Amino acid sequence: MGTFLVPELIRLGYAVDVISKDDVHSDNPDLRYYQADFCNDGIRNEFLDKNYDVIINFMHYHTDVFRNIHPSLLSHTGQYFFLSSYRVYADEKVPVTEEAPRLLDVSKDAGLLASDDYAIAKCRCEDILHASGKKNWTILRPAIIYSHANLYTFKLVSLNGDLVMPRTRMGKPVVLPREAMNIHAAMTWGGDVGKMVSRLVDNPAAMGEIFTISSAEVNTWGGIAECYKNAVGLQYALASKDEFLDILSNNPEDRECQRWGLDYDRLFDRVIDNAKVLKATGLKQSDFMPIRDGLKLELEAAANTPAPFNKAASARMDSFLSKQG
């Protein structure tokens, strides 16, 4: 997300410090990079002592960790951005608005609720902010974001770029669950995410508020598969949900986590009403990149980038396809 957000912030006149594990250099006096690990308590406290006007935090926290560190995060900045996810939403309201019920509040899946799964942890961290007694936070609930800067973000249903990209380059089909093909999906170009988030910075309308960060464009997973096909020649075959999960993982615990992600997100109709973020930022839906154009742009930009490769899942995919004749 930072790949597109940082230039937007610089363009809007902000001075930006970026903390990254990568060694990055800048010739812009308003942009400084620090190679550091923000998870380290000592390093984090060093940066918090700078008392930034705004902190935009893209890290994922388990609930217990965030409960311990959120007081210092909130007390050392004027506005703290917490990265949640649109995955917190249950499947009870279409289109989805910020007031839609959350999984944590309505799910009957005891195993999910007993876990600190990604979506559940996000819900609980949101609740921690609400209970903090402060209002200098802004919660971001982004939909699926794609960008050439991270090839893992080229997603298709539950597949990540470590299967979509290498198999497409090898001319091999990917396997998708047929149950998902007519389900609506929410994917947004990273550049549009940068536009939305940058305009919430130092914005009084964003204080103590939650925003779904997404285009309102409506597509099905089948339609998005066709966008990949048109952009880079992706081929795909269909399987049942159970067959698809068997391909993703042969570890029972991990398979259950994959099932949660499929059943409680990718198989939910994700039609987004983004009126709230449009109102707060002054943007219009027409300002956003259509997914067919955005995917083509980012896939072309990533054409010469080595792709991560999930060899084990790819081998299971090959095995499944060989049995189909």
Give the location of each predicted region.
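Conserved Rossmann-fold NAD(P)-dependent oxidoreductase catalytic core, especially the SDR/UDP-sugar
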Residues: 70-124, 130-132, 138
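Conserved beta-loop-beta element that borders a ligand/cofactor-binding pocket
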Residues: 126-154
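NAD(P)H-binding glycine-rich loop region in Rossmannoid oxidoreductase-like domains
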Residues: 25-28, 32-77, 82, 88-91
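Mid/C-terminal beta-alpha module of Rossmann-like enzyme folds, strongest
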Residues: 196-261, 274, 296-297, 302, ...
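Glycine-rich Rossmann NAD(P)(H)-binding loop
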Residues: 176-183, 211-218, 229, 264-265, ...
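Short-chain dehydrogenase/reductase
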Residues: 95-126, 154-162, 183-187, 191, ...
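N-terminal Rossmann-fold NAD(P) dinucleotide-binding loop
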Residues: 2-3
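Substrate-positioning beta->alpha
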Residues: 156-165, 177-201, 208-209
